[in-house]
Swiss-Prot record:
This is Large ribosomal subunit protein bL20. GO terms for molecular function: rRNA binding; structural constituent of ribosome. Keywords: Ribonucleoprotein, Ribosomal protein, RNA-binding, rRNA-binding. Belongs to the bacterial ribosomal protein bL20 family. It comes from Picosynechococcus sp. (strain ATCC 27264 / PCC 7002 / PR-6). The gene is rplT.
Length: 116
């Protein structure tokens, strides 16, 4: 069986890693071994943080809705309970957007929830 030297395959693999490491500082973008470590770390962090992003935004929306609800005399938990009782199905993202962009409309939603 003929010998396989893998020159092209190895070069292609290393070029791919160095291309992914473009923009990293110093040897992290120049030397294959350190670049490979940094690319692996970056991909791991990106994978983790794509999931964390969803949690972070939900927390942000809840904080914003809670702050706006307290200005209108309700806590966040009471507001969500009242909204559920009033059959108002506005998600946290939309409530937070209303609270920031249009506080009067948010106040009206709170009043409807209070009356339920």
């Amino acid at each position: 069986m003929p010998r396989v030297k893998r020159g092209n395959v190895a070069r292609k693999r290393r070029k791919k890693i160095l291309k992914l490491a473009k923009g990293f500082r110093g040897s992290h973008s120049k030397l294959f071994r350190t670049a490979n470590q940094q690319v692996m770390k970056a991909l791991r962090n990106a994978y983790r943080d794509r999931r964390k992003k969803k949690r972070d935004f939900r927390r942000l929306w809840i904080v914003r809705v809670n702050a706006a609800a307290r200005l209108n005399g309700l806590s966040y938990s009471k507001l969500t309970h009242q909204l559920k009782k009033a059959n108002i199905e506005i998600n946290r993202k939309m409530l937070a957007e209303l609270a920031v962009v249009d506080p009067q409309a948010f106040a009206q939603v709170v009043e409807v929830a209070k009356s339920a």
